[in-house]
Amino acid sequence: MIGKSLLTFSTLNEGILLKRYKRFLADVELDTGHIVTAHCANTGPMTGVLKPGGRVRVRYAPSPSRKLSWSWEQAQVVNQAGNRIWVGVNTALPNKIVRLAIEAGCFREALGEIARIRNEVKYGRTGNSRIDLLLTPGENNCDQRQIFLEIKNTTWTDGSLALFPDTVTERGQKHLQEMIDVLPNARALLVPCISRNDVDLFAPGDAADPIYGNLFRQALSEGVEVMPCCFGFFSDHITWEGMRPFRETQTIFPLP
């Protein structure tokens, strides 16, 4: 299944990133010479992929319900091996492509048959949190527990090592604790969605958020499962690039 196309779309427009500002906005000079303002769904630091002057891909999708007609979808980076890689930066996509991967059978070996998938289901101690995906096993699945699946868009790398998070994330810390809470009556599955196809391994971003790293290791010891998965980003489609192994700690290095 490696290289299987999961999502196709109209060819994206390419250009140069001029700047990102006010967290949600990015000015892009298209290859046509026109300058447009695109919506940036990723409000974090985008460590290693936010590079003014770098090439980007944007989507034109005008709608009466949207203030901006353009969306920033991908960024091109040069990795430590000197290769140019396209990285998915639209944080609205990971939930969609992970669900598509499950439906395509990419997780079947790890999860067994899945009968039902629900999005954004309320859970947690207060009932105010929402799990990204709630999976119901098929009747032939040997483990009939529901699967609470939390997805994390992962774009930061150190060489071939993918890292999440790239900044302090109290929300991410809370999610780990809530995943521990659903055990043992259900399965809890953390899926780092690695939105680039040039990595071999995943680890928690201890340098960016040591509390998250500690909670990650606690979650592992309590029984939370971790399944990093990798995707390839192209101008008109996204591909499944397989699972990746993980390690429990990051070699500490300073953030750029």
Swiss-Prot record:
This is Sugar fermentation stimulation protein homolog. Belongs to the SfsA family. It comes from Prochlorococcus marinus (strain MIT 9211). It holds the Pfam family SfsA_N. Disulfide bonds: none annotated. It comes from the Bacteria. InterPro entries: SfsA (IPR005224), SfsA_C (IPR040452), SfsA_N (IPR041465). GO terms for molecular function: DNA binding.
